[in-house]
Amino acid sequence: MDKYNSNVKIHKASHEAVILRVYPDYSCRHYLAGQYGSLGLISDKGNKFVKRAFSISSSIINSDTRDLINQKDLNYYEFYINRIPISHKGREQITPKIFRLKDGDRIFCGEKIVGHYTYQSDNHWQNIILIGTHTGESPNNSIVNYLLLNKLNINICNINVGPDGWISSYKLEHDILEKMYSNYRFIQFIDNSKNYNMLDQFFLDFISNNNEATKKTEFNLELNSTLIMLCGDPKMIGAPIKKGGWDYEYPDYGLINISKNNGFTIKTRFKGGNINYESYW
């Protein structure tokens, strides 16, 4: 199809998720770690173009050479996509079509890359905790890659949340990084509750500097020196809901609620803060 402008390579695949490397016909654009692009495919009936935004991911390190990946040297974009139940209601889904792709298939990859879920060095952070549900790990991995590549003196804890049986497709890379970098910690957090009750309790313990929690993260969560980054399920995040103008409603659930109650503030385009988030499902 004329809309297609990129080739697909399946980097890793399981029943639950797939890592695609998308090689565009055009030169890859520079982007900030944590931002998102878009992928598109023609509908099954051939009469509609289905497009959706996806965060750009990163394998962080070459597992064979042990060299950190530098996105500026790449001729592809990497996407980490979670399988979702097929819905026959509402707009057509692109995800089931993505899971049918094979090496060499064509796809649309948008040239525009945007997003505010990025690491800003406007504060000399000593610690960063990144929490993502399922493939919400994608932008967090890109940010970890940026932090390690630039040799920033910062403690990093990267937490991936999922139910029993969920394992990050990047587990090998995380294991290698933990052995190579004393300031890097990856936690595969299992939470089978409907509303992330187990994660909430862990985070509450962590924010209270409970010994058991800080043993896992390997640093204390301190108000003036720690950046919190949250990506994925809105229920996990508890993001504020815009009511109009500058009026927001803050849910009484989620990690933002816990953080705000302990003095942390949300970062926006117009003011600084130590919570950054991006909700999607």
State where each predicted segment sits:
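FAD-binding FR-type
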Residues: 16-129, 262-266, 270, 274-281
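Conserved beta-strand residues within beta-sheet cores
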Residues: 4-5, 53
